[in-house]
Design a protein with these regions (language model features):
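Charged helix-capping and loop-helix junction motifs
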Residues: 138, 166-172
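Short glycine-cluster motifs
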Residues: 20, 69-158
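Peripheral docking tails and interdomain loops at the edges
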Residues: 10-98, 170-209
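Short glycine-rich, flexible loops that bind phosphorylated cofactors or substrates
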Residues: 161-162
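Short amphipathic alpha-helices and their capping/turn segments at secondary-structure boundaries
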Residues: 2-4
């Protein structure tokens, strides 16, 4: 009953046979078969995580983000590998990398160089080469968030000197305009720069991974 009104996240130790024996010797009680426990979680709509890092990530998302209207994701990535990994993660967790509307594709294509192709994931690197770092983020976010086929956005950035502007300030405007559409940011790069962006983004309620 709790899971219908408030998200319930569980991290269970003792998944393997060895782990179950260790749990039994520690608590003196029998451990539940992991497949049975997994089935119970799915039936009760309980979110099961695999490790402490995933637990923190999931709880952070619930703490910062609104519940999206659906599972349709637009991925905006400044690195090909980052976009592909985001698409893989969406597939793994039941999210749909949605087909963007024709209007959105046309809008993106008009700002791309001749060799660029609009799609989802949105490859923002060609946009960056054409219009610059800040404008490429703004244009991509605006196009994705205005699309009725998009419920949430995953933005994958690379920490480089060209991104040394206040990304949080830019994104905060979109949060105000589209409060019902969650925005999640992933940053790849040097720790010092990543930490700086992370602090500013999470201050405005945008989780960074």
């Amino acid at each position: 009953r709790v899971s219908k009104t408030k998200p319930l996240v569980i991290l269970k130790a003792g998944k393997s046979e060895v782990g179950m024996k260790a749990a039994s010797s520690h608590t003196g009680s029998l451990s539940v078969n992991d497949r049975v426990f997994d089935a119970v979680c799915k039936r009760a709509r309980i979110i099961r995580v695999e490790n402490l890092e995933e637990l923190v990530d999931v709880v952070k998302a619930f703490a910062y983000l609104p519940i999206p209207r659906g599972n349709r994701v637009a991925i905006i990535s400044f690195t090909g590998a980052g976009g592909v990994m985001s698409a893989d993660s969406c597939s793994r967790y039941g999210l749909s990398v949605t087909d963007l509307s024709e209007n959105t594709l046309t809008r993106l294509q008009s700002n791309l160089p001749s060799w660029g192709r609009a799609g989802n994931p949105i490859d923002a690197e060609p946009l960056f080469e054409r219009v610059g770092a800040e404008s490429s983020i703004r244009l991509s976010l605006e196009a994705a968030l205005e699309d009725d086929r998009v419920d949430c956005v995953s933005l994958v950035l690379v920490s480089m000197p060209v991104f040394d502007f206040n990304i949080a300030r830019l994104i905060s405007g979109f949060k105000l305009r589209y409060p019902e559409k969650p925005i999640v940011v992933h940053i790849i790069g040097l720790k010092e720069s990543v930490d700086s962006h992370t602090r500013k983004l999470e201050e405005i309620g945008v989780p960074v991974y």
